[in-house]
Regions:
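Accessory nucleic acid-recognition modules appended to NTPase machines
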Residues: 1-83
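Short, solvent-exposed polar/charged micro-motifs at secondary-structure junctions
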Residues: 35, 86-91, 122-124
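Active-site-adjacent loop/helix micro-motif of nuclease/hydrolase catalytic cores
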Residues: 54, 98-107, 121-123
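Short, glycine/charged-enriched secondary-structure capping and boundary segments
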Residues: 58-59, 106-108, 126-128
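Conserved catalytic cores of phosphodiester-cleaving nucleases, focusing on short active-site segments
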Residues: 71, 85-104
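Hydrophobic beta-strand segments of well-ordered beta-sheets in folded domains
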Residues: 89-92, 109-113
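Short, positively charged
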Residues: 116
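Domain-level recognition of nuclease-like catalytic cores that cleave nucleotide substrates
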Residues: 119-135
Length: 135
């Protein structure tokens, strides 16, 4: 019985971190967004927190974390089979660097490449920094 209570406490504490804005979570695409749903992926809300725990964080992880933190404020995030993130079950995002192409999300409706180190977007390629304006 004690194990079940501890699990409930962990779930409530995790949910408090998500609601307080310290963490963002993305569930599997086919699951609902409730407190008891195990997240597929957990993101820090602030990329600076990542450096406190792991100074050698990969650039790709930082990019995904930044995008998730900006989208999580007004959208529900889920993990797709292809791509990196889905917002509100509708918009698919693939995150990468300047040379990131469309091959991983080719032919998927409402899909976008979010690229770091570009100033201006074109077609369905969006600069990563632009998502900072959503916040």
């Amino acid at each position: 019985m004690g194990g079940l209570v501890m699990q409930d406490v962990r779930i409530v504490r995790f949910d408090m971190l998500v609601r307080s804005g310290k963490l963002a979570k993305a569930t599997a695409a086919d699951e609902g967004m409730n407190m008891l749903t195990k997240p597929e992926k957990v993101f820090f809300h602030n990329t600076n927190l990542m450096y406190c725990l792991t100074p050698m964080t990969s650039v790709g992880t930082l990019r995904e974390t930044y995008l998730a933190s900006q989208l999580a404020v007004g959208h529900q995030l889920s993990m797709p089979e292809q791509g990196d993130l889905v917002a509100d079950g509708k918009w698919l995002f693939e995150v990468g660097g300047k040379s990131k192409g469309f091959s991983q999300i080719k032919g998927i409706e409402n899909s976008f490449v979010v690229s770091d180190n570009i100033e201006i977007g074109y077609d369905t390629k969006i600069p990563l920094w632009l998502f900072g304006l959503l916040y």
